[in-house]
Curated annotation (Swiss-Prot):
<dbReference type="GO" id="GO:0006412">
    <property type="term" value="P:translation"/>
</dbReference>
<protein>
    <recommendedName>
        <fullName>Small ribosomal subunit protein uS9</fullName>
    </recommendedName>
</protein>
<dbReference type="InterPro" id="IPR000754">
    <property type="entry name" value="Ribosomal_uS9"/>
</dbReference>
<dbReference type="InterPro" id="IPR020568">
    <property type="entry name" value="Ribosomal_Su5_D2-typ_SF"/>
</dbReference>
<dbReference type="InterPro" id="IPR020574">
    <property type="entry name" value="Ribosomal_uS9_CS"/>
</dbReference>
<comment type="similarity">
    <text>Belongs to the universal ribosomal protein uS9 family.</text>
</comment>
<dbReference type="GO" id="GO:0022627">
    <property type="term" value="C:cytosolic small ribosomal subunit"/>
</dbReference>
<keyword id="KW-0687">Ribonucleoprotein</keyword>
<dbReference type="InterPro" id="IPR014721">
    <property type="entry name" value="Ribsml_uS5_D2-typ_fold_subgr"/>
</dbReference>
<keyword id="KW-0963">Cytoplasm</keyword>
<dbReference type="GO" id="GO:0000462">
    <property type="term" value="P:maturation of SSU-rRNA from tricistronic rRNA transcript (SSU-rRNA, 5.8S rRNA, LSU-rRNA)"/>
</dbReference>
<dbReference type="Pfam" id="PF00380">
    <property type="entry name" value="Ribosomal_S9"/>
</dbReference>
<dbReference type="GO" id="GO:0003723">
    <property type="term" value="F:RNA binding"/>
</dbReference>
<dbReference type="GO" id="GO:0003735">
    <property type="term" value="F:structural constituent of ribosome"/>
</dbReference>
<keyword id="KW-0689">Ribosomal protein</keyword>
């Protein structure tokens, strides 16, 4: 009784302190973020950013896979950027592992050609505040009299 192995990959996306982890497996094209469909992502203005990989690559590439995404940390915008990165990385990893190298290369080229941050994390972090001023670089005004 040989059971078919579950074809799945797990990828993460990061932006500032937000982390999104995507579990990608064979399925019917469901994409859920913290248990809710991707079409109901809030805030509505940033919804297109979350579905960007799907719009770029076409829905047909996502019909054979189910994605479950858990996201935590950061703010609204950072979470959306972490989600889109983890979706893109998970699809590339799934195609590399279970489909073929040619399809994976096509997907990767499309994504990198549009926006490199879909596959590569943004290393910028908030600079810590220093003494003698209100922020990291701003100084208190100097008075001569």
């Amino acid at each position: 009784m040989a059971e078919k192995a579950i074809e799945s990959v797990q990828c993460f996306g990061r932006k500032k302190t937000a982390v999104a982890v995507t579990h990608c497996k064979r399925g019917r094209g469901l994409i859920k973020i913290n248990g809710c469909p991707i079409e109901l992502v809030e805030p509505e203005i940033l919804r297109f950013k979350a579905v960007e990989p799907i719009l770029l690559l076409g829905r047909q590439r996502f019909t054979g896979v189910d994605m479950r995404i858990r996201v935590k940390g950061g703010g609204h915008t950072s979470q959306i950027y972490a989600i889109r990165q983890s979706i893109a990385k998970a699809l590339v990893a799934f195609y590399q592992k279970y489909v073929d190298e040619q399809s994976k290369k096509e997907i990767k080229d499309i994504l990198v050609g549009y926006d490199r941050t879909l596959l590569v994390a943004d290393p910028r972090r908030c600079e810590p505040k220093k003494f003698g001023g209100r922020g990291a670089r701003a100084r208190f005004q100097k008075s001569y009299r």
